[in-house]
Curated annotation (Swiss-Prot):
The keyword Metal-binding applies. This is DNA-directed RNA polymerase subunit 12-like protein. GO terms for biological process: DNA-templated transcription; pollen tube growth. Zn(2+) binds at C21, C24, C38, C41. The keyword Zinc applies. One of its GO terms (cellular component) is RNA polymerase I complex. Its main location: nucleus. It comes from Arabidopsis thaliana. GO terms for molecular function: DNA binding; DNA-directed RNA polymerase activity; zinc ion binding. Belongs to the archaeal Rpo12/eukaryotic RPC10 RNA polymerase subunit family. It is found in: Nucleus. Keywords: Metal-binding, Nucleus, Zinc. SUPFAM superfamilies: RNA polymerase subunits.
Length: 61
C-alpha cells in the first residue's frame, strides 16, 4: 500500500454545518477552519441549527 493511497483513503468529505446568527437570524454554512462570524452582519454569536432524524420526529404532535 503506497503512502499516497493511504492518504486518500483516510480523507473524509468536508462536513458543512449550518449555524443561525444570534443577531440577524441569517443562516450561515460553515466548514472547519472558517471564521466563526455571521457573513451578513459580522455578529460572532452563532447557534447550531438542529436537524431532526427520522427516528426523532414525533407523529401527531
Amino acid at each position: 500500500m503506497d503512502l499516497q493511497q493511504s492518504e486518500t483513503d483516510d480523507k473524509q468529505p468536508e462536513q458543512l454545518v449550518i449555524y443561525v446568527c444570534g443577531d440577524c437570524g441569517q443562516e450561515n454554512i460553515l466548514k472547519r477552519g472558517d471564521v466563526f462570524q455571521c457573513r451578513d452582519c459580522g455578529f460572532r454569536i452563532l447557534y447550531k441549527k438542529r436537524i431532526l432524524d427520522k427516528k426523532e420526529t414525533r407523529i401527531g404532535v
